Every structure is written in C-alpha cells, then in structure tokens.
C-alpha cells in the first residue's frame, strides 16, 4: 500500500507493523531498504480483523512515533526555508484533510498550518486518503488570529474560492512566499 510505503521515507519512526502473511516479503524489503529495526508481525486475515476491529483490505497496518510538531519559534524556523504553505481552519473531517494534503503536495505546498480545531492530520483515515502525503509535509498549529498573523509575517496570503468571479490562479504570478487559505 502506498501510504505504508511513504511512511518509510517520511522521517516518522516506525514502531511495528502487522501484515498479512502474503504481504510480509514486500514489508521485509522496505524494512531492509530503510534500515528499520522494529517488529514485523504477520497473521492471517481473520486474526487481523480481530486485532484491528475492521477489515483492512490492503492487509497492512503500522504504528509509528510522530515527528515532534514544531511549536513557538520552532515554527518560524521550519517556515523560514519554504515558499508555499496551506493554512486550514476548522477542518474536522479526516477524509477532507487527507484529500487536501494529497492535493497540496501535488501542487508544491511544503507545509500545513492548522488551527486548534482541525482534526489530527495523522489519523488513519487522513493518512490513507492522502496516500501518505500528509506524513511528508511539516505540520504545525496556530492558536489564535494573532498567532497566525505572527506566523504569516512576510507571506502573501491568498484566500481560495471556487466562485466564478474569482481570479484564475493559473493566470496570476506567484509571490515568493505564498500562504493559501
């Protein structure tokens, strides 16, 4: 599965994986290629369903330790070298967040900046819908409008809308530092 393969290149530390017997050879290859030293458990489909509580049609699930989420001035350090970020507010559907993360990565967005009301970007559903792309983008949170204004100092902000009267973003010149909302 693509999301699991992307986990290996994301910088998140893999703790263990549970796979169907027939998936083990591919996971063993990934473990070796990325020097992962974590348990790899195998089982049959019935056991996996009993352990996870649902039918994983791909037959692979992994647990990983998250990279620390930047806070305070660390956020500015992460943003310093970037040119395009996405700012998300009040997004509480994991499928929507996953779809946005996947699309954002395709369009060169380098980080996700989320308010405190946004769902955890690392929920199983968000990771799966994003096809693992959410694992690659630095993610940080802001706590208030003032906090966001401080983070976006020096950034040009574009509010996106599908409304027919909006400017066509493909016709606009991109500023050197762009925050998409």
Go through each PLM region and give its residues.
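N-terminal positively charged helical leader segments and presequences
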Residues: 1-55, 59, 154
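RNA substrate-binding interface of SAM-dependent RNA methyltransferases
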Residues: 5, 9, 41-42, 68-169
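Short active-site oxyanion
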Residues: 13-17, 36-39, 110-112, 137, ...
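Short, hydrophobic beta-strand segments that form beta-sheet elements in well-ordered domains
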Residues: 17-20, 156-162, 179-181
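Short Pro/Gly-enriched coil loops immediately N-terminal to beta-strands
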Residues: 55-57, 132-133, 174
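Conserved catalytic motifs of the protein kinase core domain
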Residues: 59, 83, 177
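Glycine-rich phosphate-binding loops that contact phosphosugars or nucleotide phosphates
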Residues: 62
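A contiguous loop/helix-start segment that scaffolds small-molecule binding in enzyme catalytic cores
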Residues: 171-180
């Amino acid at each position: 599965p693509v999301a699991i393969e992307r986990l290996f290149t994301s910088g998140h530390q893999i703790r263990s994986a549970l796979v169907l017997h027939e998936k083990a050879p591919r996971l063993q290859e990934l473990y070796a290629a990325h020097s992962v030293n974590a348990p790899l458990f195998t089982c049959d489909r019935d056991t996996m369903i009993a352990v996870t509580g649902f039918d994983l049609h791909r037959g692979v699930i992994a647990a990983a330790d998250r990279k620390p989420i930047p806070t305070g001035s660390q956020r500015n350090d992460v943003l310093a070298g970037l040119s395009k970020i996405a700012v998300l507010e009040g997004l509480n559907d994991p499928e929507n967040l996953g779809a946005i993360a996947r699309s954002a990565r395709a369009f060169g967005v380098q980080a996700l900046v989320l308010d405190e009301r946004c769902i955890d970007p690392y929920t199983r559903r968000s990771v799966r819908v994003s096809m693992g792309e959410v694992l690659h983008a630095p993610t940080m949170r802001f706590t208030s409008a003032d906090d966001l204004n401080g983070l976006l100092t020096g950034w040009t902000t574009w509010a996106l809308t599908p409304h027919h009267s909006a400017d066509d973003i493909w016709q606009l010149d991109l500023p050197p530092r762009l925050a998409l909302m």
